[in-house]
């Protein structure tokens, strides 16, 4: 895919300083760090190296990446690294994709209590799947799953939901056998939805009772226990959105899919159309359109575009990818070996191409743009240092 001509970094560099001044005191430290990281990514501010071709006289400078998990430019290499690490976990079984979505009324609470409510979303979604799968009426097995949190819709609005990838089966209670689910069917979504709703609302009530929720502005009145309890009443009667997508075509397709989902950010640079002092335009999918092309162009005031990007910054240290059940980090290796033995399956050896467009990664040196030869590093320089070479930046040389 060709490099985009416009980036979120351009918006931040051009209009970020004014945004920070106008919203001083209303931006938290993680948001400020993300803005700074995105602005400085692959610029001289972060240092870098000079690479020279081994066949011709071409040289170019590659500036370091910020490696921030919210940076649109830094996710390709991170996704590839993650995918390679997960290759050995693949099993020769069907894989299912289950999505848990929070209602709008809960999403509002989540926005003001990100760590607490997003954490509860992970916990209750996993508990729901583990409980229903363990029930002999459904599967009667101990399953495993990988969950990925997304907090955005296509228009960058706040829309928290959890993507859960689950192998189609699990270990028997005594661990002596593999229990496969029915072909093409995992678990009943209505049963999942009802249990998820109950577990989540119970957990949310506990968070409120123990003083772990904070409310401000339009939600300030929810600090009152009586008003908060009344607020949850209607949510107990509405249907919560839990749906299961059809199984993947192959275990390898799971990784290709996951690598696109695990390290996504609120918007990719390729979706940007234009950016001016007053307006930013970008492509988005309008799912209200039932037929034909869903893609539309949205134009937002520049301040609103930046605000929408920043509402998806996660709290420091919060893990947006989690493994549960037999895929939990502490037991995964042993459980995978046991399951492979039960299925008489060999370890996965399918190769995966680890492509990266990150020129600052010494392990992912791009070929010479002039002759296609191999590039090698001849000089490195730190933040604040000026390279001795007068070669152009990699983006201009490529």
Outline where the language-model segments fall:
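Beta->alpha loop/short-helix hinge microenvironment recognizer with preference
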Residues: 1-398
